[in-house]
């Protein structure tokens, strides 16, 4: 048997200290904001049948062909650790009778899994927050989700003092007919330049031509710049839909910029596509993204159902939030005489029940315990000691932040008598 300590798996992380506080701050802020917008909390399985993702994401996408953690269970069924939330939520909408709640607003957060190259802010086990509106085909649903995302980022403090730090980039993919006409025009255009495109784009030309538009390869840039734009193919209905989204954002005071090359490669995406981007994280600049996916339910065997949603990586948001120190302890209860240990336990328990964060210092040298408590930096210290053979208490308020605690501390002193 090996005596070597197993090392962490590449692409995973042990989150602790200020990083854990920043992570928790993102989740807590998301939970508070989703309640303001009346999104219902859902919890989804960490693994699903592989077909849930292969049918929703597409067999030829990189996520399905290269990045999914798939395995056979003991019954021989192919299962996959979830690489994203939307497909599982869509499956539940169809299998669990959630249609009765349409339009349904749901939100969740948790770990996801993709086998990709780890880099700054990107892991093989990573975490996302996610919000979806299912069963609402009106532009107002898109507006609500975008306004919610904008408020979330502002309440996280991202870009609060630097308005240019995060930008909402917005595009329309049109309705089904508009998208197909645009796709055909792109195929014709790129085929004329196929030999000069990158290898990835040559491959995408037949499988997923819209994805050529967001290629980062310098060889593709001259051709993507002059490629046909969706605006030339939009139906009147699609133009009206996008106009209502942008006017809704303007009314809500959400700044946005048009990004005509912003696309979603899968055929079930329609109308609105969006990303909140930043230059604060290097080349990987998207911090929150989403769009309308009106054709997804049909891909999973359900009836046509309009839907729109977004997701954001918690790790990346936490990086933008910056380090968050742990909150200061309200009161440290110091037991300066071992005979008063049970009294110390009584006091620290009482404070916690009253909603006051408290720590007990009752070990080590009795003479050094008070100094130890001072170094811990709490707002106040309650010390218990024996004086002339009798229990006695005293408290020390470290700063104005502890003023509200005086009543509880004075009650403790009154019980034992002042030192």
UniProtKB/Swiss-Prot annotation:
It is found in: Cytoplasm. It catalyses: tRNA(His) + L-histidine + ATP = L-histidyl-tRNA(His) + AMP + diphosphate + H(+). InterPro entries: aa-tRNA-synth_II, aa-tRNA-synth_II/BPL/LPL, Anticodon-bd_dom_sf, His-tRNA-ligase, HisRS-like_core, HisRS/HisZ. CDD domains: HisRS-like_core. It comes from the Bacteria. Its EC number is 6.1.1.21. Keywords: Aminoacyl-tRNA synthetase, ATP-binding, Cytoplasm, Ligase, Nucleotide-binding, Protein biosynthesis. PROSITE patterns: AA_TRNA_LIGASE_II (PS50862). Belongs to the class-II aminoacyl-tRNA synthetase family. Homodimer. This is Histidine--tRNA ligase. It comes from Novosphingobium aromaticivorans (strain ATCC 700278 / DSM 12444 / CCUG 56034 / CIP 105152 / NBRC 16084 / F199).
């Amino acid at each position: 048997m090996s005596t070597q300590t197993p090392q962490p798996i590449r692409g995973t992380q042990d989150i602790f200290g200020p990083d854990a506080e920043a992570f928790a701050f993102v989740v807590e802020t998301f939970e508070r904001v989703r309640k303001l917008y009346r999104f219902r909390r859902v919890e989804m399985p960490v693994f699903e049948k592989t077909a849930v993702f292969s049918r929703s994401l597409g067999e030829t996408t990189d996520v399905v062909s290269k990045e999914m953690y798939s395995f056979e269970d003991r019954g021989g069924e192919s299962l996959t650790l979830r690489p994203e939330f939307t497909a599982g939520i869509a499956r539940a909408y169809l299998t669990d009778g959630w249609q009765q709640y349409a339009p349904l607003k749901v939100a969740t957060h948790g770990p996801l899994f993709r086998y990709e190259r780890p880099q700054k802010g990107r892991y093989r086990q990573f975490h996302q927050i996610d919000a979806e509106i299912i069963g609402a085909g009106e532009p107002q649903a898109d507006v609500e989700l975008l306004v919610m995302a904008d408020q979330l980022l502002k309440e996280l403090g991202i870009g609060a003092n630097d308005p240019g730090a995060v930008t909402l980039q917005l595009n329309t993919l049109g309705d089904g007919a508009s998208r197909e006409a645009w796709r055909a025009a792109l195929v014709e255009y790129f085929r004329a330049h196929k030999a000069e495109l990158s290898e990835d784009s040559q491959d995408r030309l037949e499988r997923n031509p819209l994805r050529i538009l967001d290629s980062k390869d310098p060889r593709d840039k001259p051709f993507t710049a002059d490629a046909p734009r969706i605006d030339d193919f939009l139906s009147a209905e699609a133009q009206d839909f996008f106009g209502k989204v942008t006017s809704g954002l303007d009314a809500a005071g959400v700044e946005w910029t048009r990004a005509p090359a912003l696309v979603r490669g899968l055929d079930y995406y329609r109308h609105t596509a969006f990303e909140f981007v930043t230059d604060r994280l290097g080349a990987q600049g998207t911090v929150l993204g989403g769009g309308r996916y009106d054709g997804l339910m049909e891909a999973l065997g359900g009836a046509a159902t309009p839907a729109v949603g977004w997701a954001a990586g918690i790790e990346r948001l936490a990086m933008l939030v910056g380090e968050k120190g742990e909150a200061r302890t309200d009161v440290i209860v110091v037991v300066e005489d071992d005979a008063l240990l049970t009294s110390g336990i009584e006091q620290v328990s009482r404070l916690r029940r009253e909603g006051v964060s408290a720590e007990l210092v009752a070990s080590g040298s009795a003479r050094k315990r008070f100094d130890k408590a001072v170094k811990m930096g709490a707002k106040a210290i309650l010390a218990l000691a024996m004086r002339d053979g009798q229990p006695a208490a005293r408290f020390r308020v470290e700063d104005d932040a502890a003023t509200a605690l005086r009543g509880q501390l004075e009650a403790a002193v009154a019980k034992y008598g002042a030192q």
